[in-house]
UniProtKB/Swiss-Prot annotation:
NAD(+) binds at residues 219-221, 253, 282-287, 305, 340, 361-363, 409. GO terms for cellular component: cytosol. InterPro entries: Adenosylhomocyst_ase-like_sf, Adenosylhomocysteinase-like, Ado_hCys_hydrolase_NAD-bd, NAD(P)-bd_dom_sf, S-Ado-L-homoCys_hydrolase_CS. GO terms for biological process: L-homocysteine biosynthetic process; one-carbon metabolic process; S-adenosylmethionine cycle. GO terms for molecular function: adenosylhomocysteinase activity. It is found in: Cytoplasm. PANTHER family: ADENOSYLHOMOCYSTEINASE (PTHR23420:SF0). This is Adenosylhomocysteinase. Its cofactor is NAD(+). Substrate binds at residues 71, 156, 218, 248, 252. It catalyses: S-adenosyl-L-homocysteine + H2O = L-homocysteine + adenosine. It holds the Pfam family AdoHcyase_NAD.
């Protein structure tokens, strides 16, 4: 037997050759391995770290629970972590972002077969329900030996961290609070999972929290959660904010989005972008990548912003700065990229053009009022996976919604390209090494990687692209007040 097809009613882990997992189809492993080998060539940061640390094995003893999009690029990250000595369990951080062949390749491993896998436990498949998503998250955090729980977390969006910290908080309170009637459906599912587990294990999450040495967080939304936990005094372990490393936020967030937004819209709709009116909600690093991508396709781009500095940047690049209410009725394509909630509400959706395209590229699905749309009485026709046509009976107008309001670049396409993810994942690997090997130097606060490590990641990728850096003379370095080998900029420098 080589397949392992997931069905809705099969939420128990599969076990083969001592590895527990739940993925779509193990027989996809060979395809996944071929793509993984190509990705390795495009990810010089991770491959350089493998070579640098192969003998030292700095992550030996680390049991990393990872919650991050289960893509081909993430597969290279996972196998980098294991190459440096870590044990790993994995789940995706989004119900639509898993690439099933990548998940299969990771479970089978480079030296296994579908019948005899020798890789890493993965609990992820494309098209999970929310119940399945949170089940998979719990499996990722539940190690086989209860005396050896997870001792590191690698997170994207903060769901794994939230599961542990909220679980511990409710265990200490002795009760999981009831959901309110108007709570989002996902929050109700989350609380139900914790309540069910509390009935059988009163201190599961407390034990995990006490074991974890630290968390490294990939994205803007997850970092916001970390700072909120820290401000409330609820952060139980040190955290490194990988997102705000320059070689992450200024590259993955902007240049990765510039590539993958167009890919997602093209695969989802095949609509011509040139000449169309496009509204980008938010002009942070992700929004800048979106606006630049659309402009490059010949679209007429407008931007919404709350921050006057970002708004002025947008205008200096030639974009109109408008409100949603001003622009929604004329827009052919609307993309949310704010990291905030309640950006495009039902009244906005109803005001959109017939067959306008609506999508989100922020981490969560609450930027677009999908719950309101579902309650509105509009009819939904699924055109193909992650593409839905919603039609309002009173007006007859239809709206094309991508990936149910979740990340369209991962739901409708394959996410950011390998080279830019090499920057981000090199930072993740370095951050894991930093927290694991120097844990006594960190308090339960949120930190950023030091500048010299950011520059190290950049240097690797400049060389991979054939660039040649100018070297300071000793006299020049003294004049600038820096070391010849860097760091070259103060921490407050904005690039």
């Amino acid at each position: 037997m080589t397949g392992n097809l997931v069905t809705k009613n099969s939420l128990t882990p599969d076990v083969r050759n001592g590895i527990d997992f739940k993925i779509a189809d193990l027989s996809l492993a060979d395809f996944g391995r071929k793509e993984l080998r190509i990705a390795e060539h495009e990810m010089p940061g991770l491959m350089s770290l493998r070579r640098e640390y192969a003998e030292v094995q700095p992550l030996k003893g680390a049991r990393i629970s990872g919650s991050l999009h289960m893509t081909v690029q993430t597969a290279v990250l996972i196998e980098t972590l294991t190459a440096l000595g870590a044990e790993v369990r994995w789940a995706s951080c989004n119900i639509f972002s898993t690439q099933d062949h990548a998940a299969a390749a990771v479970v089978v491993g480079p030296h296994g077969t579908p019948d005899e896998p020798k890789g890493v436990p993965v609990f992820a498949w494309k098209g999970e329900t929310l119940e399945e998503y949170w089940w998979a998250a719990e499996q990722m955090l539940t190690w086989p030996d209860p005396d050896k729980p997870a001792n590191m977390i690698l997170d994207d969006g903060g769901d794994a961290t939230m599961l542990v910290l909220r679980g511990m908080q409710y265990e200490k309170a002795g009760v999981v609070p009831p959901a309110e009637e108007d709570d989002p459906a996902e929050w109700k599912i989350f609380l139900n999972l914790l309540r069910t587990r509390f009935e059988t294990d009163k201190d599961k999450w407390t034990k995990i929290a006490e074991s974890v040495k630290g968390v490294t967080e990939e994205t803007t939304t997850g970092v916001l959660r970390l700072y909120q936990f820290a401000a409330a005094g609820d952060l139980a372990f040190p955290a490194i904010n990988v997102n705000d490393s320059v070689t992450k936020s200024k590259f993955d967030n902007k240049y990765g989005t510039r590539h993958s937004l167009i890919d997602g819209i093209n695969r989802g709709t095949d609509a011509l972008i040139g000449g169309k009116k496009v509204l980008i909600c938010g002009y942070g690093d992700v929004g800048k990548g979106c606006a630049e991508a659309m402009k490059g396709q010949g679209a007429r781009v407008s931007v919404t912003e709350i921050d006057p500095i970002n708004a002025l940047q947008a205008m200096m690049e030639g974009f109109d700065v408008v409100t949603v209410e001003e622009a929604i009725g004329d827009a052919d394509i609307v993309v949310t990229a704010t990291g905030n909630k309640d950006i495009i509400m039902l009244e906005h959706i109803k005001a959109m053009k017939d067959h306008a395209i609506l999508g989100n590229i922020g981490h969560f699905d609450n930027e677009i009022d999908m719950a309101g749309l579902e309650r509105s009485g509009a009819t939904r026709v699924n055109v193909k996976p992650q593409v839905d046509l919603w039609t309002f009976g009173d007006t007859g107008r239809s709206i094309i919604v991508l990936s149910e309001g979740r990340l369209l670049n991962l739901g409708n396409a394959t996410g950011h390209p390998s080279f830019v993810m090499s920057n981000s994942f090199a930072n993740q690997t370095i951050a894991q090494i930093e927290l694991w090997t120097k844990n006594d130097e960190y308090d339960n606060e949120v930190y950023r990687l030091p500048k010299h490590l950011d520059e190290k990641v950049a240097r690797i990728h400049v060389e991979a692209l054939g660039g040649h850096l100018t070297k300071l003379t000793k006299e020049q370095a003294e004049y600038l007040g820096v070391d010849v080998e860097g760091p070259y900029k103060p921490d407050h420098y904005r690039y």
